[in-house]
Design a protein with these regions (language model features):
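A short helix-turn-beta junction within AAA+ P-loop NTPase domains corresponding to the substrate/partner-engaging
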Residues: 506-510, 720-733
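Conserved lysine of the Walker
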Residues: 470
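Post-Walker A helix-loop "phosphate-sensing" segment adjacent to the P-loop in P-loop NTPases
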Residues: 480-490
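Hydrophobic anchor at the beta1->P-loop junction of P-loop NTPases
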Residues: 462
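Hydrophobic positions on the alpha1 helix immediately C-terminal to the Walker A/P-loop
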Residues: 473
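Conserved P-loop NTPase
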Residues: 748-800
Length: 801
C-alpha cells in the first residue's frame, strides 16, 4: 500500500473516545466557555469601556454621559421661585424622549475625618496667641463633629442613548448635554459635564464608602495591563445573602421605594438626603412615547369598561341594582379617565420611575439601623421602602451613575409627579483655601466657611437690633482674619466695645476725644490717595463732606459754597504736592485761612462754621497726625467725641483708613474695615455720596469694608442705600424689628420662610446673604472659653483687660 493510500485510510478512520476522555473535554469546554457569571469584582461592574472625554460604553449599543450639578436654596425660597424651579424641572423632563434614559444620583459619602479636620487646624506660631489659636481650633472641631460636614454631598444626572457607533453617540450626547446644562442654568444651579477620570472617581467613592482616596492616571493603563475597572473595584463583592451584600470590609443593602401615596411631597427626597450616614439615592427615569402612553391608558379604560359591564351583568343576574359597582373599579375608572385627560390636554407626559436607596455601614447591625431609618422616612410620606430580595447585585450596579437600570420594578408617573422629587434642598456655603468660619447652617447643621475675597464685591453689612449679636459677629470675624490671614484690620468704634479684643490681640487703640492727646489730621493725604493722577479730586470730595457736617442744615452745601471750598483745597495742598514733607501737610487752620482770603460772603460763611473746630472748644482735629499706626489691628475709639463730633469723627476715621488701604494696595495686602453706626454716614447728601464713592473704591483697592448698624430704617432711607446694597455681596441679618423685616424682605428678596430666622431669633442667629445665596445660620461660641470672654459686651461676662 502506498503512503498516500495509508494517509487516506487513517484520515477516514473514526476516532473513538473513551467515556472518561469525553468528560474531560466537556469539562475543559465548560471552563473556558464560562457559566455567564462574573468571577471577579471587576467583571461585576457593568460597563464595557470608558473614554477620556467622559463617554461610557455601557453595552455595545448603549452610551452614557454624566453631569454634576450644585444644590440651590429651594426649601426656603419664595413661593414664586419654588414654582419657577418646579416648572423648569418639568420642562427638563418633557425635553426627554423615549430614546433617552435619565438617572439622577445623590451621593452622600463620608470622608476621612482626620484629613478633613486638618483643614480647620490653625498651626501654633510660638507667640502670645497660641492659646487662642488652640481654643479657636477646638471650637471649629466641635462644630465639625456636631454638624454633617463629615459627609460630602454630590448630585449627578446621567443620560443614556443608543447608537450604532461611538462617533454617532458622541455627537448626540454633546447636543443633549448643552440642552441639559441650559435647563440647570435656568433653575439657578451650576452644572458641568464630567470627564472619564471624574466619573471613575464617583464610582470609586460608591465602592469605597470609607473614603479611601482615588488614584488614577491614563498613563498607568498600558504598562500595567489594567483596565479602568481595576482602579475603582473594591477588594471583593459578596452577594450570597438575599437581602444584603458585602463590599470590601463593609456591608450594604439596596431597597426600592414603593410609591403608595396618592399625593407626593417635594420634601421626601430632601429628607432621605438629610442624614449623617452615607447614603446613595438613585432615580431612574424612562420617558414613554406619548402616543404609546395614550394608547396604553385607552386600553386600560377599555379593560375597565369591560369589567364594569361584566359586573353589571352579574348584578342583573343576581337581582340587585346594576349601578352598584365595586368601589375599586369605580375609582380606577375615574383615575384612568383623568390621566387620559391630563396626557391629552395638558403639558404632561408619562414616565417609568425606579427609586433606589443604597445604604452602607461597617456592621450588619448599623446597616439594619440605617435601613430602618430610611424606611421611616418613606413611611412618613405614606410610601414603603422594600428591600430587594435576591437582586442586591443588580441593585448595587443600578446605583452606579452609568445610566442603566437592572431593576425592573417601575412606577408609572406623569411629568409633574416625577418632578415632585425636586433634586434641590438648600445651598451650602463651604469654600476651601483661605475660607473663614461664619457659623453653622441652621437648616442642615453644616459649617459655613467663606472667603469674602472671592466674592464679586466683598463689601458687607451687618444689621440687627440691640442685643442681637452684631458686635459679637464682627469680633468673631476680626479674630478669624487675625488668626488666618496676614491682613490688616481697622475698626471705627463709637461705643468703645472692641477694647478687650484689640488689647488681647496686642492691637492698637487710638482714642479720639476733645481732651485726648491723640491727634488725627482730617487733611492727611498721600500720593496714592486716588487712582487718578490727581489725588486732590477725591480729597476735595472728602473736604466737602467734612464741611457739610460742620455747617449742618437740611439742604447741604450750596453750589457756590462747594466752589469756594474746592478752590481753597487747591490752594492749601500746593506746598505739600510740590514738596511732600510732613511739615507741609495742611491742617484745618490752613483751610480756614484759604477761605477767608477769598473775601466773598459764601467763603466767609464756611470759615465762620469752621471757627469752632479751628480755634474753639472742638479743635481736636486742628492738629497734624501724631499717632504712628504700625499695628495689624487698630481700633479708633470715638466714644468720647460726643454727639456734635461723632459723625465728623467717623468720616475722618473712614478717610484715614482709606489712606491705609491705598498704602496696603502696593504691598499686596488686604485691609478690613469695620464701621459701627454706619447709618450716620449716610444721612447728609454730600457725606453719603462720599461714603458711597469710598465704598465702591474699597473693592478695587483690596479693601473689605463692613458697615454695622441697628438703625435699619435710617440706613434704608438713605438715597445712596441702593448703591451700597449693589456693592455689597455679604450681608449678615440678625434679629430684626417687625417693620424692618418687611422692608428688608422687599429689598433683599427674602422669602417668608427665610424671614422666620430673623424674627425673635437668639443672639448670633439670623440670615447670611452671600452673593445670591441666602442661608439661615447660628454662630454659638461656648461661654466657658477665653474667646467668649474677650468678645462679649454683656455686663459681668466680659474679660478684664
Amino acid at each position: 500500500m502506498s503512503k498516500k493510500q495509508k494517509n487516506e485510510t487513517s484520515a477516514k478512520a473514526p476516532v473513538k473516545l473513551t467515556r472518561a476522555e469525553k468528560k474531560e473535554i466537556q469539562a475543559v469546554i465548560r471552563k473556558y466557555k464560562g457559566d455567564g457569571k462574573p468571577h471577579s469584582a471587576q467583571a461585576s461592574i457593568p460597563y464595557e469601556a470608558m473614554y477620556q472625554d467622559g463617554i461610557c460604553r455601557v453595552t455595545p449599543r448603549t452610551f452614557s454621559k454624566c453631569i454634576e450639578f450644585t444644590d440651590i436654596s429651594y426649601q426656603l425660597a419664595q413661593a414664586d421661585t419654588k414654582t419657577a424651579i418646579f416648572e423648569n424641572l418639568c420642562d427638563l423632563y418633557n425635553y426627554l424622549d423615549a430614546s433617552i434614559h435619565v438617572q439622577f444620583s445623590f451621593i452622600n459619602r463620608k470622608i476621612d475625618p482626620k484629613q478633613y479636620a486638618k483643614s480647620f487646624e490653625i498651626r501654633a506660631q510660638g507667640d502670645d496667641f497660641d492659646d487662642i489659636r488652640s481654643e479657636y481650633s477646638d471650637i471649629l472641631q466641635d462644630q465639625l463633629v456636631n454638624g454633617n460636614n463629615g459627609l460630602m454631598k454630590r448630585k449627578f444626572m446621567t443620560y443614556t442613548i443608543e447608537a450604532d457607533s461611538l462617533k454617532m453617540a458622541r455627537a448626540r450626547l454633546r447636543r443633549i448635554e448643552t440642552d441639559l446644562l441650559g435647563y440647570f442654568k435656568s433653575m439657578g444651579a451650576s452644572a458641568w459635564g464630567l470627564d472619564a477620570k471624574e466619573r471613575l472617581e464617583v464610582m470609586h467613592s460608591i465602592f469605597h464608602p470609607d473614603g479611601e482616596p482615588f488614584s488614577f492616571d491614563w498613563k498607568w493603563l498600558a504598562p500595567s495591563g489594567f483596565s479602568t475597572k481595576d482602579f475603582i473595584a473594591p477588594s471583593s463583592f459578596r452577594f450570597g445573602n438575599a437581602r444584603m451584600f458585602g463590599l470590601g470590609g463593609k456591608y450594604g443593602a439596596v431597597s426600592f421605594l414603593q410609591i403608595l401615596s396618592p399625593e407626593l411631597s417635594d420634601e421626601m427626597l430632601a429628607d432621605f438626603l438629610n442624614t449623617e450616614n452615607g447614603i446613595v439615592v438613585n432615580l431612574h427615569v424612562q420617558a414613554i412615547d406619548q402616543s404609546d402612553a395614550i394608547k396604553t391608558v385607552k386600553r386600560k379604560i377599555t379593560d375597565l369598561d369591560a369589567m364594569k359591564i361584566q359586573e353589571q351583568k352579574r348584578a342583573v343576574r343576581s337581582g340587585y341594582d346594576m349601578d352598584i359597582l365595586p368601589s375599586d373599579l369605580a375609582t380606577y375608572g375615574q383615575d384612568a379617565k383623568e390621566l387620559l385627560k391630563t396626557l391629552q390636554s395638558r403639558n404632561e407626559r408619562m414616565f417609568q420611575l425606579t427609586f433606589l436607596v443604597l445604604n452602607t455601614a461597617d456592621t450588619r447591625q448599623k446597616l439594619e439601623n440605617d435601613v430602618f431609618w430610611a424606611a421611616g422616612i418613606a413611611q412618613k410620606y405614606n410610601c414603603s421602602l422594600v428591600r430587594l430580595d435576591y437582586q442586591q447585585e443588580q441593585g448595587l450596579m443600578s446605583s452606579l451613575p452609568l445610566g442603566a437600570s437592572h431593576i425592573q420594578i417601575e412606577r408609572s408617573l406623569t411629568t409633574s409627579s416625577v418632578a415632585v422629587f425636586v433634586p434641590f434642598v438648600t445651598q451650602e456655603l463651604f469654600q476651601g483655601g483661605d475660607a473663614m468660619y461664619y457659623g453653622i447652617n441652621a437648616k442642615t447643621g453644616n459649617m459655613i466657611m467663606l472667603d469674602r475675597k472671592r466674592a464679586r464685591c466683598p463689601n458687607g453689612l451687618k444689621l440687627g437690633t440691640p442685643g442681637s449679636g452684631k458686635s459679637m459677629s464682627c469680633k468673631s470675624e476680626i479674630l478669624s482674619v487675625f488668626l488666618c490671614t496676614p491682613d490688616d484690620v481697622y475698626i471705627c468704634d463709637p461705643e468703645a466695645e472692641y477694647y478687650p479684643l484689640v488689647k488681647r490681640l496686642h492691637g492698637q487703640v487710638v482714642k479720639l476725644s476733645p481732651t485726648s492727646k491723640n491727634y488725627v489730621n482730617p487733611l492727611d493725604i498721600n500720593l496714592n490717595y486716588s487712582e487718578d493722577e490727581n489725588p486732590l479730586a477725591l480729597k476735595s470730595d472728602f473736604v466737602l463732606s467734612f464741611c457739610e457736617l460742620v455747617m449742618g442744615g437740611k439742604n447741604g452745601l450750596e453750589a457756590i459754597e462747594k466752589t469756594v471750598i474746592d478752590r481753597a483745597v487747591q490752594v492749601i495742598y500746593r506746598p505739600y504736592l510740590a514738596n511732600p514733607k510732613p511739615e507741609n501737610m495742611p491742617i484745618l487752620a490752613d483751610l480756614h485761612k484759604a477761605l477767608l482770603d477769598q473775601h466773598i460772603p459764601e467763603a466767609d460763611r464756611v470759615a465762620q462754621a469752621l471757627d469752632l473746630y479751628v480755634s474753639g472748644s472742638l479743635n481736636v482735629f486742628n492738629h497734624r497726625t501724631n499717632i504712628d499706626i504700625k499695628n495689624r489691628i487698630v481700633a479708633f475709639d470715638i466714644k468720647e467725641l460726643g454727639k456734635q463730633l461723632k459723625k465728623i469723627g467717623m468720616l475722618i476715621v473712614q478717610d484715614q483708613i482709606w489712606g491705609r488701604v491705598t498704602q496696603n494696595r502696593s504691598k499686596g495686602k488686604a485691609t478690613w474695615y469695620f464701621c459701627d453706626e454706619f447709618h450716620l454716614l449716610l444721612r447728609e447728601e454730600q457725606t453719603a455720596a462720599f461714603s458711597c464713592e469710598i465704598w465702591k473704591r474699597f473693592r478695587k483697592w483690596g479693601g473689605i469694608p463692613t458697615g454695622v448698624t441697628q438703625n435699619v430704617k435710617d440706613l434704608l432711607s438713605s438715597p445712596e442705600i441702593e448703591n451700597i446694597l449693589e456693592n455689597s455681596d455679604f450681608i449678615c441679618l440678625l434679629n430684626q424689628a417687625s417693620g424692618d423685616r418687611k422692608i428688608l424682605a422687599e429689598r433683599l428678596n427674602i422669602s417668608p420662610q427665610q424671614l422666620r430666622y430673623v424674627d425673635n431669633s437668639e443672639p448670633g442667629e439670623g440670615l447670611l446673604i452671600y452673593e445670591n445665596v441666602i442661608l439661615p445660620f447660628k454662630n454659638p461660641i461656648p461661654k466657658n472659653t477665653q474667646i467668649y470672654q474677650i468678645m462679649t459686651t454683656r455686663l459681668g461676662e466680659g474679660a478684664t483687660v
